[in-house]
Curated annotation (Swiss-Prot):
Belongs to the frog skin active peptide (FSAP) family. Medusin subfamily. This is Medusin-DA1. Residues 23-48 form a propeptide. Residues 25-47 are annotated as: Disordered. Expressed by the skin glands. InterPro entries: Frog_antimicrobial_propeptide (IPR004275). It comes from Agalychnis dacnicolor. Pfam families: FSAP_sig_propep (PF03032).
């Protein structure tokens, strides 16, 4: 009977360790995914800012060409 208890405790302990390792890996994967999404958002925002400056640049160039 004591052997069965020890075996059962060992199995439960190893199961919990395995579960915690899987949860940790899952958490790390989610963090990497969130960081990647944040980087992508920042890149899109930079592109939008640059595209928003195009009309201003065209306006400045046309003003300069009228003067010169």
């Amino acid at each position: 009977m004591a052997f069965l208890k020890k075996s059962l405790f060992l199995v439960l302990f190893l199961g919990l360790v395995s579960l915690s390792v899987c949860e940790e890996e899952k958490r790390e994967n989610e963090e990497e995914k969130n960081e990647q999404e944040e980087d992508d958002r920042e890149e899109r925002n930079e592109e939008k800012r640059l595209l928003g400056m195009i009309p201003l640049a065209i306006s400045a160039i046309s003003s300069l060409s009228k003067l010169g």
